[in-house]
Design a protein with these regions (language model features):
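Short gly/pro-enriched beta-turn/loop segments at secondary-structure junctions
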Residues: 146-152, 189-191
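Alpha-helical scaffold segments that mediate packing/assembly in large oligomeric complexes
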Residues: 73-145, 160, 275
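Beta-strand elements of well-folded, non-transmembrane domains
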Residues: 31, 71, 258-262
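Sequence/fold signature of self-assembling virion shell proteins
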Residues: 1-5, 121-139, 166-276
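Short acidic, glycine/tyrosine-flanked loop/strand segments centered on an H-E-D-like triad
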Residues: 50-77
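Polar-ligand-bearing catalytic/cofactor-coordination segments
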Residues: 155
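Acidic glycine-/aspartate-rich tracts in secreted/extracellular proteins
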Residues: 33, 160-163
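N-terminal "assembly arms/tails" that initiate or stabilize quaternary assembly
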Residues: 1-58, 270
Length: 276
């Protein structure tokens, strides 16, 4: 249940951080090698080439929230085991984590709909169209972004973006896939070499019209790290004999917590499509 709302981190490079190893995780982003155009001298080894790598670091941070449930409410509510509160907190945890990932994805490469050069020039007709998808895929290919193992890039949109995409005549709905058992969470369909999932929230910029962000990215474009021992979890705490902050057992608590980090590894491999 706590995982229900997590759409945006799909496709991330995931690396857990063991306890006792500090708060910083390092990833390496390798630069493409020059192409070989000449054969070596017969019978000899080629010259060794140097790998060029950039270290990308991210720091794990704590995130948490909780609510108090009065003893009177817990004794008189129709839902005595607080299932409703647990569900609400679980959804909030998932949506909060999703938002943190989405905000980090905003650090990718911008593509303004309708070939506009300023966000203020985006009009209501500049939607997240099939043509925008084609342009994003072209950019990713030029940047040598890696596709996922299924041969597709991954797209992440919102209700504003999906409305335009699903009206295109070349759109393929997810339920028509031959391999329909291997869907992403929230998958809608695919278009021009991109499989799309939909989240309920969107990064919005208020301008001449409201402008929303959708994303298309390749494999290894961003990373997510969880601290072992403090992964995302919902906690239910009942009054206890040793609880000094609750001396007369007047409340219980329901909350969630996690230690987590997300980081864009290569902004050239994430296209942030800004559209109406």
């Amino acid at each position: 249940m706590v995982q229900r709302s997590q759409i945006m981190e799909q496709g991330a490079q995931k690396r857990p951080l063991p306890t006792g190893n500090g708060k910083v995780v390092y990833f390496q982003r390798y630069s493409p090698l020059a192409l070989i155009s000449q054969s070596p001298t017969e019978g000899s080894n080629p010259d060794a080439v140097d790998l060029s790598a950039t270290n990308v670091s991210c720091t794990v941070a704590e995130y948490a929230s909780y609510t108090k449930i009065s003893k009177l409410l817990s004794l008189t509510a129709i839902d005595p085991k607080m299932k409703g509160a647990v569900e609400v907190m679980g959804i909030n945890a998932g949506e909060s984590r999703d938002a943190l990932v989405r905000l980090e994805l905003d650090n990718g490469t911008e593509q303004l709909a309708g070939s506009k050069t300023l966000i203020s020039n985006i009009a209501s007709s500049d939607t997240f169209s099939a043509n925008e998808v084609r342009k994003a895929v072209k950019t990713l290919k030029i940047q040598k972004a890696m596709k996922y193992d299924d041969g597709y890039f991954l797209g992440k949109t919102n209700p504003y973006g999906s409305y335009a995409l699903m009206g295109d005549s070349t759109w393929v709905n997810a339920h028509t896939y031959k391999d329909g058992d291997n869907l992403y969470k929230g998958e809608l369909g695919r278009l021009h070499g991109v499989r799309f999932v939909e989240g309920s929230e969107a990064t919005k910029t208020s301008s001449t019209v409201d402008v929303y962000n959708s994303y298309i990215h390749g494999k290894e474009a961003f990373a997510v790290t969880d601290l072992e021992g403090d992964r995302q979890h919902v906690y239910v705490k009942n009054p206890g004999a040793n609880s000094t902050d609750n001396p007369v057992d007047r409340f219980s608590t329901v909350g969630w917590a996690m230690s987590f980090a997300v980081k864009v590894l290569d902004p050239n491999w994430i296209i942030v499509c800004k559209h109406a």
